[in-house]
């Protein structure tokens, strides 16, 4: 038997428009996919995962998490980019966490890697 799948399937049938086009509302209700990307809402999740080469499921009904409780004001120059919900690339977790703290938590992880 294969291992159980992680996450929950999302029923995307209600978001289908004409042909393969999906038109999504702009309301922000972030969800985290099993690909560790944050999607602005369930409709955008459906639109952006429709043609992926692998199945993506919903991991949680909030933005994907990055643990920022233990971060340093002084950051190294290592390059492991993170994309913030503000559309900016952060060179590494430390720099991202500093931005999260400065924004008082309004910035969250959009995805691992560059925007």
Swiss-Prot record:
GO terms for cellular component: extracellular region. Gene3D superfamilies: 3.30.60.30. Pfam families: Kazal_1. Residues 6-66, 67-115 form the Kazal-like domain. It comes from the Eukaryota. Coiled coil: none annotated. GO terms for molecular function: serine-type endopeptidase inhibitor activity. It is found in: Secreted. The record marks 77-78 as: Reactive bond 2 for elastase. The keyword Secreted applies. Its main location: secreted. Keywords: Disulfide bond, Protease inhibitor, Repeat, Secreted, Serine protease inhibitor. The record marks 26-27 as: Reactive bond 1 for trypsin. The keyword Repeat applies. Disulfide bonds join 12-46, 24-43, 32-64, 68-97, 75-94, 83-115. This inhibitor is composed of two homologous actively inhibiting halves: one which inhibits trypsin, the other which inhibits elastase. This is Double-headed protease inhibitor, submandibular gland. It comes from Vulpes vulpes (Red fox). The lineage of its organism: Eukaryota, Metazoa, Chordata, Craniata, Vertebrata.
